[in-house]
Design a protein with these regions (language model features):
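Short, well-formed alpha-helical segments that are part of the catalytic scaffolds
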Residues: 1-16
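Residue-level signature of catalytic and energy-coupling elements of molecular machines
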Residues: 11, 62, 80, 149, ...
Length: 222
């Protein structure tokens, strides 16, 4: 709730329209108890009310809606004030044909108060583990700022429920030959309390990377 209005106001809608994009802003609400839904609706956003709990469940529901609507490209960013929506055009400019692009915080403008040393070290270790296990280069595994072509989303095979979703998107790209590009981005201190728990969620992400090395395809997409 705290960052939504500011983030919406900074989306470069006019610049995107001038480039030929027809835009829509979609908010996936994971059962929030604050004013997120009412603020989103007042701003003119489309709201998806998430079924089930967890970031992964919400993202997969958003992907499904995207494919039903029939749009061509999708930009995803966490709505916590850490990512700069002004940089959406930079991601779209670098989007490979039939691929995805990941905003790279670790080689971009990472503000000094934006990430704890524990999270920075954990992200580096998880990113190293991802490449060691799956071979495809990636520089910021846990980034929450991605852009996707429609073809890439159609090919992703996912069943993650929580914060391991980005890791599974990466492994699916690695095993299905989906092109990945990387763009350095700005990363600022978040608004509000973080939901990502360093140890618990880091362990879940590592487990997902290992499982997808042994079983590249989910047994069941929930």
């Amino acid at each position: 709730e705290g960052a939504l209005q500011d983030i919406y106001s900074r989306i470069p809608i006019e610049k995107l329209k001038n480039r030929g994009y027809s835009t829509r802003v979609v908010v996936v609400d994971g059962g929030s108890s604050d004013n997120t839904v009412s603020i989103a609706e007042e701003l003119g956003c489309e709201v998806i009310r998430q079924r089930g709990e967890g970031k992964g469940a919400g993202m997969r529901q958003g992907f499904k809606k995207f494919l039903e609507i029939g749009d061509d490209e999708l930009v995803m960013l966490d709505c916590d004030g850490t990512y700069h929506p002004e940089e959406i055009t930079r991601l779209l400019d670098s989007l490979p044909e039939n691929g995805i692009v990941i905003g790279d915080r670790l080689h971009g403008n990472l503000h000094s108060d934006a990430m704890t040393s524990t999270n920075w070290i954990g992200n580096q270790l998880l990113t190293w583990l991802a490449v060691a296990l799956h071979g495809k280069p990636i520089y910021d595994l846990c980034s929450g700022f991605w852009a996707f072509s429609r073809n890439a989303i159609e090919r992703l095979q996912l069943n993650s429920m929580r914060f391991e979703i980005e890791a599974e998107m990466y492994t699916s790209c690695a095993h299905r030959g989906i092109p990945i590009a990387h763009v350095p981005i700005t990363y600022s201190k978040r608004v509000g309390e973080a939901k990502l728990g360093s140890i618990k969620d880091g362990t879940s992400i590592a487990r997902k990377l290992i499982i997808r090395r042994i079983f590249p395809t989910p047994h069941e997409e929930r």
